[in-house]
């Protein structure tokens, strides 16, 4: 049809081929051998394009564009399609059958055969969900994720990469691309082949154990010539199948000099081994990394293990064909660190869906699985439980309002469902931190936590203790008032709230224990006082034990999380922007499983509040509040208070994974016990160091790549930490601490004059973290290059928004410590006892307690409003006497207008009681402060 086509390129001679191309002896269809030059298909076509462009007197870019324009108008059945990977002379292209699949956003449910193995069609469909398009400096090709967070790649695609170079991955189903950071320590090359395993990529959803579909080394003798296919992810994002004949390549290895006869009459031994595969299938630029699969043998019988190897090269002779390197099950499993499997969870998730229909609320940042049946759909509240109080607007103008929950809300000008905007929280893609810096920062955080927490003291738990906690500070019980989550809530009897219906409750005497002489030994005394104790009902307990057993085997159980809009008050500006926050609710069994694996760490993390970098669990009306400020002033009186935008949704996957590894290594090992309440028999699950770390890696994958439900749309996210995760605040706090140290690592590298090791961070910075909030006192020695402006600019390059605590943006270089805001509070020295630090909260927060109430059918609205006024007055004391009395006057004026009882002036009593808490002693309102001044001072010392 005119113009330039690939057939116009002259055949290459050996002299034309770049130095890295090798010459090999490969068999042809008739069994004879031919000296054939091969190279990677990407290098091959790039070289041919360069020659053709020089012949025509045009640039390579012009050549590619003209070819693309030409083939886009041709019949894809008979002509060339450069983008989809079909190349070569059309006459030879007919020799192999090419099928291009433009798959829907979600594949159909995958049934299993009676033998338990997937047939070829379903096996490739499962692989398609984990077959990526990888883009490096060398070009693009396919790459298969397998056995967890591992990627099978071609070595020639990564040879030019340096540590910390970014690599782009294009996921299936046209999901937004992701970026990963290269580091050579994560690469394991398989023998001397062109195949490598890229290990531990947290940004990838954990893949099934595809190694079980690859051929075993012991079965290679069964493969000679057979029908097969190449399975590839094309540049257009679609899956491509290339069908043809595959032939095994066998080589001979001699032990000694060939043909030498020994004295005993035997020849020197030789070994014939299979080294790869060749095929008559035509391939093209970008086909590397594709999976070679066997369809059936010469007798028409299917192979049990069909995956044979990875495509690495195309022929440069006039004959069409391709070459693949052998990859066996043993090769894969010998190269990876953690052999985990997610196939059961994926198959179960897909079997829940009755169609592949997408939902308009779910954007390209999610991987859509499909639509569930109407009976399984999730529903969001459409009516708020927050109403105006009788004193609305009488004390102070409102600065908040109930969040918008429906598209029909008159305050919603776009009439778009607020869930659409809320879901974008998890759709953002961030750039990974440099892998070379992440490792030392993780080690620094792990060391700091080990020094702060000390060694783990307990190494076992019963399931009842997981639910109720134990008689040790920090071991709080499971919260019973919240929803039990997906499916469980449909079992809840009418009129009941929370999750208590899934538990049996009883009153226990002091000294009660969940153990006995036939089970685990009791590491602590029983309960210190009578309390209500909960035991799981059989259905829930069985499900929890099955989930724990699944994790123990290295497999991921299926947990379904629900997106729910938060029924809360939002700033008026957020209302105007229809910015409603989202809550991702976990199933109760997922919460109990997470508690079982991490409760010892979480309890110690809360117990040691104010001793390391964490403020989680702090009582701001305690001496710890003053300690936080005092520790910062020991380093500097200047620094910054910070916060992150969309923190949960943009949380770095690698750092989430690192956080869970830290928890696993601190715990080291764990034994979980379950008692059969009918027979009294105990059973246990023993998590050794490897099993525990593997289980928590699977839970990290659960938190990062969560299966979520919004209405009837089941989808999976790619990064972030779900807000309903019981470990949310712990993970967020640890990752927040890592963020600032990674910023320090980058900025001190950017300023060579500051030749400081990463460990010097704690010498020049004193920080405190609570979730996404942080405060940093920064030494003047480094403030010129490690300051809030430089920090926010660095985070912006990674797609993270770092701003001041009031969300107004970083406008000043630094702040005084006395002006810091942390947890919506500040530090204010007492006017009489300067060492005591008050914790005044934002005045708007106090005022809003008088404007709104939440509907509670069990409490009279007037009594509820009065309780809120009382709480507001107690908070007003933390400011000063003048603020309190002005606020009291406004409150009483408002109450008088509404014919409600007014409040007396109780400033002195409130202050005395609060000072006792600030000093760490119990002081009643009747106790004179002067009589306790010695006690207060002694506490300070």
Identify what each model region corresponds to.
Residues 6-11, 15-38, 43, 49-94, ...:
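Viral RNA-dependent RNA polymerase
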Residues 270-273, 284, 291-371:
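C-terminal subregion of chymotrypsin/trypsin-like serine protease catalytic domains
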Residues 166-168, 212-215, 219-231, 254-259, ...:
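Well-ordered, non-membrane alpha-helical segments in soluble/globular domains
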Residues 114-175, 291-304, 308-316:
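Catalytic histidine site
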Residues 135-137, 155-156, 198-206, 277-285:
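A structural micro-motif recognizing beta-strand termini
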Residues 185-189, 196-260:
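Active-site substrate-binding loop(s) of clan PA
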Residues 152-154, 159-180, 189-193, 231-233, ...:
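Extended, non-catalytic subsegments within catalytic or DNA/protein-binding/adaptor domains
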């Amino acid at each position: 049809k005119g113009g330039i086509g690939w057939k116009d390129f002259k055949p290459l001679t050996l002299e034309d081929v770049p130095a890295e191309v090798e010459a090999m002896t490969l068999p042809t269809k008739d069994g004879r051998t031919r000296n054939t030059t091969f190279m990677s298909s990407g290098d091959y076509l790039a070289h041919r394009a360069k020659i053709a462009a020089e012949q025509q007197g045009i640039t390579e870019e012009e050549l590619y564009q003209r070819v693309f324009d030409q083939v886009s108008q041709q019949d894809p059945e008979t002509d060339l399609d450069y983008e989809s990977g079909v190349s070569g002379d059309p006459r030879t292209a007919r020799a192999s059958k090419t099928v291009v699949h433009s798959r829907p956003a979600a594949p159909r449910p995958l049934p299993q055969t009676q033998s338990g193995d997937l047939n070829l069609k379903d096996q490739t469909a499962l692989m398609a969900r984990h077959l990526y398009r990888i883009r490096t400096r060398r070009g693009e090709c396919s790459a298969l994720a397998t056995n967890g967070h591992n990627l099978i790649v071609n070595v020639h695609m990564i040879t030019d990469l340096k540590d910390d170079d970014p690599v782009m991955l294009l996921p299936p189903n046209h999901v937004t691309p992701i970026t990963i950071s290269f580091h050579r320590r994560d690469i394991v090359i398989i023998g001397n082949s062109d195949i490598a395993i890229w290990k531990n990529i947290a940004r990838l959803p954990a893949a099934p154990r595809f190694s079980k579909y690859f051929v075993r080394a012991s079965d290679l003798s069964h493969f000679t010539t057979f029908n097969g296919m190449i399975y590839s992810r094309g540049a257009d994002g679609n899956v491509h199948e290339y069908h043809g004949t595959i032939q095994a390549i066998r080589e001979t290895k001699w032990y000694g000099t060939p043909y030498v006869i020994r004295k005993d009459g035997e020849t020197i031994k030789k070994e014939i081994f299979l080294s790869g595969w060749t095929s008559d299938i035509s391939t093209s630029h970008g086909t590397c990394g594709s999976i070679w699969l066997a369809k059936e043998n010469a007798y028409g019988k299917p192979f049990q293990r069909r995956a044979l190897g990875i495509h690495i090269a195309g022929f440069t002779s006039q004959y069409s064909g391709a070459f693949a390197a052998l990859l066996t099950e043993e090769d894969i499993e010998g190269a990876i660190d953690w052999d985990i499997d997610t196939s059961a969870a994926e198959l179960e998730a897909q079997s829940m869906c009755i169609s592949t229909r997408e939902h308009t609320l779910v954007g390209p940042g999610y991987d859509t699985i499909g639509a569930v049946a109407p009976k399984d759909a999730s529903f969001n509240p459409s009516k708020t439980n927050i109403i105006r109080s009788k004193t609305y607007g009488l004390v102070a103008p409102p600065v908040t309002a109930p969040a918008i929950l429906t598209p029909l809300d008159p305050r919603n000008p776009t009439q778009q469902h607020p869930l659409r905007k809320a879901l974008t929280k998890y759709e953002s893609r961030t750039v990974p931190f440099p892998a070379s810096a992440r490792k030392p920062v993780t080690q620094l955080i792990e060391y700091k936590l080990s020094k702060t927490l000390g060694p783990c003291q307990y190494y076992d738990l019963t399931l009842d203790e997981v639910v109720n906690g134990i008689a040790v500070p920090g071991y709080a019980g499971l919260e019973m008032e919240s929803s039990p989550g997906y499916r469980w809530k449909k079992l809840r009897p009418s009129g009941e709230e929370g999750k208590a219906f899934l538990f049996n409750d009883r009153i226990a005497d002091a000294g009660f224990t969940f153990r006995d002489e036939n089970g685990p030994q009791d590491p602590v005394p029983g309960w210190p006082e009578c309390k209500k104790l909960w035991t799981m009902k059989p259905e829930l307990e069985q499900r929890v034990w099955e989930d724990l057993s699944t994790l123990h085997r290295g497999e991921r159980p299926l947990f379904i999380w629900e997106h729910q809009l938060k029924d809360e008050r939002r700033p008026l500006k957020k209302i105007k922007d229809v910015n409603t926050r989202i809550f991702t609710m976990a199933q109760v069994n997922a919460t109990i499983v997470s508690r079982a694996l991490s409760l010892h760490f979480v309890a110690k993390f809360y117990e040691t509040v104010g001793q390391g970098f964490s403020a989680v669990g702090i009582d701001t009306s305690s001496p710890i509040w003053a300690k936080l400020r005092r520790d910062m002033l020991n380093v500097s009186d200047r620094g910054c208070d910070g916060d992150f935008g969309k923190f949960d949704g943009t949380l770095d996957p690698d750092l989430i994974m690192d956080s869970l590894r830290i928890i696993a290594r601190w715990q080291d090992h764990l034994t979980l016990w379950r008692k059969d309440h009918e027979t009294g028999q105990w059973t246990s699950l023993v998590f050794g160091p490897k099993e525990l770390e593997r289980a928590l890696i699977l839970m990290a994958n659960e938190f990062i790549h969560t299966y979520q439900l919004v209405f009837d749309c089941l989808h999976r996210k790619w990064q972030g930490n779900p807000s309903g995760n019981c470990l949310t605040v712990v993970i967020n706090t640890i990752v927040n601490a890592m963020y600032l140290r990674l910023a320090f690592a980058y900025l001190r590298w950017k300023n060579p004059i500051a030749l400081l090791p990463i460990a010097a961070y704690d010498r020049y910075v004193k920080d405190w973290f609570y979730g996404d909030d942080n405060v940093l006192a920064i030494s003047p020695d480094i403030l010129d290059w490690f300051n809030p402006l430089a920090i926010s600019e660095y985070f912006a390059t990674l797609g993270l928004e770092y701003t001041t605590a009031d969300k107004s943006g970083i406008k000043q270089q630094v702040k005084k410590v006395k002006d810091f805001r942390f947890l919506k509070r500040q530090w204010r020295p007492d006017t009489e006892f300067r060492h005591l630090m008050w914790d005044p909260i934002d005045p708007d927060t106090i005022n809003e307690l008088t404007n709104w109430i939440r509907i509670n059918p069990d409490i009279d609205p007037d009594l509820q409003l009065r309780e809120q006024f009382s709480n507001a007055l107690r908070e007003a004391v933390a400011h000063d006497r003048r603020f309190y009395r002005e606020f009291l006057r406004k409150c009483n004026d408002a109450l008088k207008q509404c014919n409600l009882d007014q409040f007396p002036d109780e400033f002195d009593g409130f202050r005395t009681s609060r000072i006792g808490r600030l000093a760490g002693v119990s002081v009643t309102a009747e106790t004179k402060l002067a009589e306790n001044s010695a006690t207060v001072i002694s506490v300070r010392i």
